[in-house]
Amino acid sequence: MLIMNLQLFAHKKGVGSSKNGRDSESKRLGVKSTDGEFVLAGNIIVRQRGTKIHPGNNVGRGKDDTLFAKIDGVVKFERVGKDKKKASVYPVNVEAIAE
């Protein structure tokens, strides 16, 4: 009796998938209004995670730690002690600037 042993092998190599190729979208954090810049009430001064820069005079802090201006004025970044910074907004006479 004739016994045939037929074995089929793969004609293409098995290919694994790569674990690369994805990244999270950037969050666009950082300083949005620079020192000495005129801002309107509600303008964002700094977008941040945590309180890297603390709110100073006339500056509010949002629930995501974003600092924003409470009044129209000029932004000033100041040091508090040795290792802390704060952002403040000081009112400015708009008529004096226009002249």
Curated annotation (Swiss-Prot):
Keyword annotations: Ribonucleoprotein, Ribosomal protein
A Pfam family annotated for this UniProt entry: Ribosomal_L27
Organism of origin: Clostridium botulinum (strain Eklund 17B / Type B)
PROSITE patterns per the UniProt record, alphabetical: RIBOSOMAL_L27 (PS00831)
Positions of the propeptide segment: 1-9
PANTHER family: LARGE RIBOSOMAL SUBUNIT PROTEIN BL27M, RIBOSOMAL PROTEIN L27
Family that this chain belongs to: Belongs to the bacterial ribosomal protein bL27 family.
Top-level taxon of the source organism: Bacteria
Official protein name in the record: Large ribosomal subunit protein bL27
